[in-house]
Amino acid sequence: MTIDILAYGEAMVEFNQRADDARMYLQGFGGDTSNFCIAAARQGARTGYISALGNDHFGQQLRNLWQAEQVDATHVLHDQQAASGVYFVSHDKDGHHFDYLRAGSAASRYTSAQLPLQAIADAKLLHLSGISLAISASACDAGLAAMAHARKHGVRTSLDTNLRLKLWPLERAREKMREAFALCDICLPSWDDVSILTGLDDRDAIVDALQAYGVGLIAFKLGAEGCYVATREERRLVPAYTVDALDATGAGDCFGGAFIARLVAGDDPFAAARYANVCAALSTTGYGAVAPIPLAAQVEKILDSK
């Protein structure tokens, strides 16, 4: 199978607190780039994943998930000496909160020497996130090497900022994300992330800064406000689609997967953003990062009715 979109990062097993019983957690799956792949696959893109898992039951569950979701896991390695990552989602009046058990995980031990260079060169697009780079020094080196290799072979690259300061200090995050921006064709930042990374507090100034690194297309995720799409020629706010949200876990990943899937399918950036806004909104109407991600038919039904 020819892969449209390859993503590199860490997949994890999720335990999401139930709203009706705080003592109970529902098991699911997460990891931002894995969520991205599944969202893109549910919109019809052919996706593949680059990572490593522990030789454990959780790792096998993730492989089973990708098989069911038609995400190619050929390039997900087994690490006999490490575990697969786990995280917990809790909910309160201030929203959702994350706690991670990922130190020393299989994905964090990934190195540049393990990259599937031919698969990257053969893909249409390579996707990473700030978390892909933050989980360890070796994983960061591998991610940047993957982006450079993709660029060398004419493969487009996309980057979701996904800043997690629990994983790395701000100065290192800024240094390495600047390197990533310089290798990035399409950036999917959120306000909180990119305002911290750039030190800027104006939307257009942030877009100017990203474009100065060479980023050609920016889809600025603004939550309930929608998405601010910027090309070299045009900048436009694409309004959000409003729903009664239950859990926003993974909504940004869903947006990214849907947006990139539609770009690869040939949509212009503004049409792709309209589609992705609906897709991400629908993903917040259930609990967990993966289970509520809608299929293309559900999104298209809403778009056709507007």
Over which residues does each language-model region extend?
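Conserved beta-alpha-beta core of the PfkB/ribokinase-like small-molecule kinase fold
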Residues: 125, 131-208, 225-226
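Structural alpha-helical scaffold elements that stabilize or flank donor/cofactor-binding regions
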Residues: 118-119, 179-180, 211
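Active-site metal-binding loops of divalent metal-dependent hydrolases
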Residues: 9-11, 131, 161, 254
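Glycine-rich phosphate/adenosyl-contacting loop at the front of the ribokinase-like
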Residues: 1-72, 246
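Conserved phosphate-binding/catalytic region of the ribokinase-like
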Residues: 1-6, 148-149, 199-306
